[in-house]
């Protein structure tokens, strides 16, 4: 396949590969949006695949569905997961994906820069807090700067329609984006999460940590008295 900078489906690699995982509520679908930075233009973001997980999945079944997608990419992606609606999901994700998981708490305010290292079972996870409007504005700025490339397909168009359909309200604190009643924004939010992660100054540190955890460990050598005789 010939490389085309405007078609992420032709990109041989992403630097790095990221899966943005929006965790839906009971009436919404959880999603996985896969992409990352271009191999030849670090500021160009490519969105290669957009997936809506089956409705009604929670906990381990939801993580298993995400793991199926992850295996299609050789289990080599950073997982950026929205933990806003279910903080306990962090434990399941950590058990399934290990140190590749970065948690995101989407709230009313926050710039998503200073993480909290939250204890999770016998380990810990970085959790970043970001305002919903701030997250969407970041993605909007990337779109306006022509720094995002979507794979062509119905799911990309659905994500665009979700973003385009958001209602805006101007308040003293800034613009508030809300989803109209009966509509969904899960794919659109996942795209914004992907863009946030791809532009984050901690990205290289996340990659280094994930790479170190996947590195095979040398077995510890033990020496008996026979080794010295």
What are these model-predicted stretches?
Residues 1-107, 114, 133, 137, ...:
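RNase H-like, metal-dependent nuclease domains and their acidic two-metal-ion catalytic environment used
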Residues 110-123:
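Short, charged, surface-exposed secondary-structure boundary motifs
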Residues 123-133:
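Conserved RecA-like P-loop NTPase helicase motor core
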């Amino acid at each position: 396949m010939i490389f085309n900078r405007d078609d992420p489906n032709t990109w041989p690699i992403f630097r790095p590969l990221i899966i943005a995982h929006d965790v839906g509520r009971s009436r919404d679908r959880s999603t996985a949006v896969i992409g990352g930075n271009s191999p030849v233009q670090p500021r160009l973001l490519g969105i290669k695949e957009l997936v809506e997980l089956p409705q009604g999945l929670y906990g381990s079944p939801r993580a298993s569905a995400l793991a199926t997608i992850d295996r299609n990419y050789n289990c080599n992606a950073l997982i950026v997961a929205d933990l806003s609606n279910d903080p306990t999901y962090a434990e399941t994700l950590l058990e399934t994906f290990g140190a590749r998981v970065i948690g995101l708490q989407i709230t009313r305010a926050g710039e998503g820069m200073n993480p909290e290292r939250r204890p999770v079972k016998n380990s810990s996870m970085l959790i970043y807090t970001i305002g919903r409007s701030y997250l969407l504005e970041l993605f909007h700025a990337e779109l306006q700067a022509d720094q995002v490339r979507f794979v062509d397909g119905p799911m990309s168009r659905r994500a665009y329609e979700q973003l385009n359909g958001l209602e805006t309200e101007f308040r003293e604190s800034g613009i508030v984006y809300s989803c109209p009643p009966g509509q969904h924004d899960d794919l659109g939010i996942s795209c914004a999460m992907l863009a946030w992660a791809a532009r984050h100054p901690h990205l290289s540190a996340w990659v280094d940590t994930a790479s170190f955890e996947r590195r095979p460990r040398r077995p510890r050598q033990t020496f008996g008295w026979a080794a010295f005789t």
